[in-house]
UniProtKB/Swiss-Prot annotation:
Belongs to the UPF0210 family. The lineage of its organism: Bacteria, Bacillati, Bacillota, Clostridia, Eubacteriales. HAMAP family: UPF0210. Homodimer. InterPro entries: UPF0210. Pfam families: DUF711. PANTHER family: UPF0210 PROTEIN MJ1665, UPF0210 PROTEIN SPR0218. It comes from Ruminiclostridium cellulolyticum (strain ATCC 35319 / DSM 5812 / JCM 6584 / H10) (Clostridium cellulolyticum). Gene3D superfamilies: 3.20.70.20. Transmembrane segments: none annotated. This is UPF0210 protein Ccel_1722.
Length: 452
C-alpha cells in the first residue's frame, strides 16, 4: 500500500528533479513491405507505419495527462531498411527514407529509426547501397535516424565497413554544414547493436522481434543526484544502495507507462530500457551524479570507477522493477546532451580519451562528440574501431555518434537545439591512423566468443 510519503516523493521527482519517461517507442516490422517495384514498396511502408502508429502520439499524451507523468518523445523504430530495400530493383534508397519521414510526420512522432544496415561480418549488395545513401537520406529528411552495426563479439570487426563509415560521416557533415552537421547527430555506428533499443538515433526493430511492440525508455539522472545529496560522506555501499532504490522507483514508473500504452494500443509490451538519459537542462545530468559522489569535475581521476558503480547500481535496482528489461540499460554519456559533460569538456577536465575509458563501463559509447571540421575520415574510422574493439572484447554494446563540425576548431561550440543540446568542439589526437585503416579486412572475433 502506498503511503502519503511515496506519493509526495513521486510528485517531487517529477516537478523538481526532472523525472520523466524519455520515450515510448513503437517497433514495427516491415518485412511484408518488400517488393521489386520501389514505389510500391515505399507505399506499403508508408501505409503500414501510419496504420499501426496512428494513435501512438495521442495515446502517449492521454497517459501523460491522466497519470501526470511527462513523456518527452513518441518514436517509431522499423526493420533495418537494408533488408527491405534489397528486394527492390532500384538503387534509389533515399526514397525509403523519404517514405519513413513522410509517415513519421503524418502520425506526429518525434523521430523514426531504422534506416539501418547490419554488416558486422560483411556487405550484401543492399547493405552497400543503403550505406552509400545515408548522407543524402539524412540531409533530405527531418525525422529519420540511421544506424550501422559494424562489429559483434561473434563476428569480430568489419574494418572495411569501419573505413567506409568514416567517409560517410564526413559526407553527412558536408551536406548539412549549414546546420552544424546535424545529419551526423542522427547517425550511430554500433558494435553489438541490440534489437529492442527504444532510444535514438540507434533504434531499429530487430528481425527476432514481433510484428509490432511497445518499448519504453526511462530517464531521471536528476532524481539520482538528489537522492545522493541525502547521503553525503557515506561509504560506497550506501551510495550503491541509494542508487538501487532510486532506480527501482524510476523503472516502476516506466513499467506502468509501458503496460498502459501496450493495453491501450493493443500492442505487445516489449521491454523497459533502464538507461539514465540526460538532457541539456540544468540538474538533469549524469556528470552531476558523478560529481555528487565526490569528484571535483567529471573527467578527473576516479570518474570511470564512479560511473561503473552508477551503471551497476542502476541495473540492480531496475531489474527488480520490471518483468522485461532490455535495450541498452545503463547510463548514457552524450556530451552535447548533458549540461555537466559540456561544462567538464569546456573546462578541460573531460577529454576524448577519458570518455573512451568511461565507455568501457557504461551504456553505449562515444555519444554526441563534436570534433574539428578538418578531422580526417581515417581518424573518425580509427575512433570507431577503438570503440568497436571495446564492445567486441567486453561483449557489450558500444557505439559512436560523432560530429566533425565544418569550419569549427577546438574550443568552438556547436548549437543543435532541443534534446541534442550544444557541444564544445573537442581535441582529437593529431597523429595519423591512415595506414592502419587502409589495411581493410576483418579483425577476428576474440577467443571468448567461442561459447558452444
Amino acid at each position: 500500500m502506498l503511503g502519503p510519503f511515496e506519493v509526495l516523493e513521486t510528485i517531487d521527482m517529477i516537478q523538481k528533479e526532472n523525472l520523466d519517461i524519455r520515450t515510448i517507442t513503437m517497433g514495427i516490422s516491415l518485412r511484408d513491405c518488400c517488393h521489386p517495384d520501389i514505389d510500391i514498396s515505399c507505399k506499403k511502408i508508408y501505409d503500414k507505419i501510419t496504420r499501426y502508429a496512428e494513435k501512438l502520439v495521442v495515446t502517449g499524451e492521454n497517459i501523460e495527462r491522466e497519470f501526470g507523468i511527462p513523456i518527452i518523445n513518441k518514436r517509431i523504430s522499423v526493420t533495418p531498411i537494408a533488408l527491405i530495400a534489397e528486394s527492390s530493383e532500384s538503387d534509389e534508397y533515399v526514397k525509403f527514407a523519404e517514405a519513413m519521414d513522410k509517415a513519421a510526420q503524418t502520425v506526429g512522432v518525434d523521430f523514426i529509426g531504422g534506416f539501418s544496415s547490419l554488416v558486422h561480418k560483411g556487405y550484401t549488395v543492399g547493405d552497400k547501397r543503403l550505406i552509400q545513401s545515408i548522407p543524402e537520406a539524412l540531409s533530405r529528411t527531418k525525422l529519420v535516424c540511421s544506424s550501422v552495426n559494424v562489429a559483434s563479439t561473434k563476428a569480430g570487426i568489419n574494418m572495411d565497413a569501419v573505413a567506409e563509415m568514416g567517409r560517410i560521416i564526413k559526407k553527412c557533415a558536408e551536406l548539412t554544414a549549414d546546420s552544424g552537421a546535424l545529419a551526423c547527430a542522427k547517425l550511430v555506428v554500433f558494435a553489438n547493436a541490440v534489437e529492442d533499443n527504444p532510444f535514438m538515433a540507434g533504434a531499429f526493430h530487430g528481425i527476432g522481434e514481433p510484428e509490432c511492440v511497445i518499448n519504453v525508455g526511462v530517464s531521471g539522472p536528476g532524481v539520482v543526484k538528489c537522492a545522493l545529496e541525502k547521503v553525503k560522506g557515506a561509504d560506497f555501499g550506501t551510495v550503491s544502495e541509494t542508487i538501487k532504490k532510486t532506480a527501482f522507483k524510476i523503472t516502476r514508473m516506466g513499467q506502468l507507462v509501458a503496460q498502459e500504452a501496450s493495453r491501450r494500443l493493443n500492442v505487445p509490451f516489449g521491454i523497459v530500457d533502464l538507461s539514465l538519459a540526460p538532457t541539456p537542462a540544468i540538474g538533469d545530468s549524469v556528470a552531476y551524479i558523478l560529481e555528487e559522489m565526490g569528484l571535483e569535475k567529471c573527467g578527473t581521476h576516479g570518474t570511470t570507477a564512479a560511473l561503473a558503480l552508477l551503471n551497476d547500481a542502476v541495473k540492480k535496482g531496475g531489474v527488480m522493477a520490471s518483468s522485461y528489461v532490455g535495450g541498452l540499460s545503463g547510463a548514457f554519456i552524450p556530451v552535447s546532451e548533458d549540461a555537466g559533460m559540456i561544462e567538464a569538456a569546456m573546462s578541460g577536465a573531460l577529454s576524448l580519451e577519458k570518455l573512451e575509458a568511461m565507455t568501457c563501463v557504461c551504456s553505449v559509447g562515444l555519444d554526441m562528440i563534436v570534433v574539428p571540421g578538418d578531422t580526417s575520415a581515417e581518424t573518425i574510422s580509427a575512433i570507431i574501431a577503438d570503440e568497436a574493439a571495446i564492445g567486441v572484447v567486453n561483449t557489450k554494446t558500444t557505439a559512436v555518434r560523432i560530429i566533425p563540425a565544418p569550419g569549427k576548431k577546438v574550443g568552438d561550440k556547436v548549437e543543435f537545439g532541443g534534446l541534442l543540446g550544444s557541444g564544445p568542439v573537442m581535441k582529437v589526437n593529431p597523429f595519423s591512423s591512415s595506414e592502419f585503416i587502409k589495411r581493410g579486412g576483418r579483425i577476428p572475433a576474440p577467443m571468448h566468443s567461442l561459447k558452444n
